[in-house]
């Protein structure tokens, strides 16, 4: 699992990287990190994601995001698993 650096957080905030919440839409709607977009792991549709940008993925505890990281990497995306929601909220300064 990767821990975001301050520069990586800035890249997300300024739109140079994606923060992708791979939980279900209901889970996402119950609370998510700022700047996150929701692409549920169950229907991983990446058509609107620019392959030239880094993708940081998270879920509830890191399990689904680990699987998504692997899948995206196999498809040529630059993806990193950053763990669970509370890890992300802490790193983003939202905890």
Regions found by a protein language model. Give the residues of each.
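Rhodanese-like catalytic fold shared by cysteine-dependent sulfurtransferases
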Residues: 2-8, 12-18, 25-54, 63-95
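Short, surface-exposed ligand- or partner-binding patches at beta-edge/loop junctions that are enriched
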Residues: 58-59
